């Protein structure tokens, strides 16, 4: 009886695993297990432009992450694979008719190597596009690593350490806009965020180089036309070669590895 009541309540538009579990005095995991056991969602046909993304699924399974298969253009969920291991995804796509798989033209993924392998082996006509969000995320991590390395050179009581620590978010912000100046007791002056960013970049030529390269990539990603993207990206990758930062050289290798 409990199972039937749980399934019935899960049909409600506003129902969540947590709310249903609380109402029936069972755990969220038990509620999810009931759903997984008795509810079978039909797979939707593959679209021409797919997106493979991961989601954390807190179930009793050994696998913490599931793979979502989505129509990239409509954001419609096509299917869920409750495991993102290579053999599971290869087997999943193998069961889909080859004619249907061959119609897929593009697949958008993050920088998870398994997704790339699966696309190459099971979706032979598809081109891979790495989600720009994840590229920017990796660039921000590279800049963050440069900042931390530079910061460790300074005494914790120094102004340089203070700026690099307290205002680190300015280096990762997509846009640092002009704001009203406020008095900063530590710096003993009225100052706004763009001015603080300038002070941070003057601390280290390496940090300034890493930051400017990250901003340049973000600009290329946003404004470059498809027909000129190949040439401009390779020019940018070549420019990265001159960076003195090992963190940027690592990022350069990542871009080359994923270039297609």
Language-model-detected regions and their locations in the chain:
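Short alpha-helical "recognition helix" segments of helix-turn-helix
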Residues: 19-24
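Amphipathic alpha-helical
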Residues: 219-260
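Basic, short loop/linker segments at the boundary and entry of helix-turn-helix/winged-helix-like folds
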Residues: 1-8
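Residue-level signal for the short linker/turn that defines the boundary of a DNA-recognition helix
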Residues: 14-15, 102
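RNase H-like nuclease fold core
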Residues: 26-118, 125
